[in-house]
Amino acid sequence: MSYFRYIDNGEGPTKLFIGGVHGDEGKDVLPLIKLLSYEDFSPGQIYIYNFDKTPYISTIHKEFYQSEQGKKILDLIDYYKPDFYTELHSYNIKHFDRLTSLERLDSQGIPPLIDCGQYVLCSSVSPLIRRKHFTKQNICQTLEFPSFRGEDLNLSDDELFEKYDYSYDLSVEEYMSFLRLITLSKNRDDFEKRVLKDYKKQADLALKYVKIIYGLDFPRY
């Protein structure tokens, strides 16, 4: 069943979080969403959605935003007009190297995802919506949590660690660390300070990539 949570924290930024963006990713991120407590949020209006399984269409393709699910997400964005917009995704851990490779710029015209550690990845949102549905002052983030498909589902925790040097608990800790950075930030300046303190390397990469895609005068988030 789809999940929705609203938190009225008074005056402050509007924050929209969406999990289960496409495919069956919602089952991976819902347990993480439920780890967030009331104390994890800044003042403001908080809206959290996690959707059931839908057909998988990549958000870097315009066909996604023409689909029923894509239109639903755009309607939420245009309705709430969030100051902070965060997509909560999961991905097949086998694709880690491909998703973080600079070859994505040549093959797909988009920058690679950025490694935050423990197989957790971050980036901005799809270029197809970043400028059309948001302002430069808005914070737009994508967070990706590692998941498993196919034969990997049959491996034990020890076997997964041996194959990928992967720990579920450490990935959860890293994912929640970045997610709480977003949930706790009171505005763009606060977010910038938190990112530069805890994720300086990733922030520098984000700036490099945004210059390639949007030019010099566009924010990295």
Give the positions of each predicted feature.
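Structured catalytic-domain cores with a bias toward divalent-metal coordination
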Residues: 1-221
